[in-house]
């Protein structure tokens, strides 16, 4: 049961990042404009990096492969995104989004702490 719960947690967390990467790819121009509005420069390059991070981190979680590296990648990305996009914490909406991101980081830290479980490439290799 424990490994099933870990697998479900990995999939649910990964979906967030994978869907985001797909949406950012589809709506690339709008996302670049939003990034520029937040004071970011080199937005095409940075958006490409963000999409790559979300895809590789998300796939790492789903496959349970190089899970710790994928989790650390996603934690760093989520923390940076939180500081860039949610600076006005006295605004209720911004505070709520920042707290949600911190909760996501908490879930990722749990995966880092307990590992990918047995349903994943890392778990299968460790069982050998």
Predicted features by range, described:
Residues 1-30, 36, 41-56, 62-128:
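Extended, low-polarity transmembrane helix blocks
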């Amino acid at each position: 049961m424990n490994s099933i719960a870990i697998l479900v947690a990995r999939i649910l967390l990964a979906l967030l990042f994978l869907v985001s990467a797909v949406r950012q790819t589809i709506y690339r121009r709008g996302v670049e404009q939003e990034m520029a509005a937040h004071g970011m420069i080199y937005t095409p390059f940075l958006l490409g990096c963000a999409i790559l991070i979300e895809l590789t981190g998300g796939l790492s979680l789903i496959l349970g492969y190089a899970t710790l590296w994928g989790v650390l990648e996603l934690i760093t990305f989520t923390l940076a995104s939180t500081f860039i996009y949610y600076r006005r914490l006295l605004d209720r909406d911004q505070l709520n989004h920042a707290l949600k991101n911190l909760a996501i980081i908490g879930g990722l830290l749990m995966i880092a702490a307990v590992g990918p479980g047995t349903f994943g490439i890392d778990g299968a290799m460790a069982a050998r």
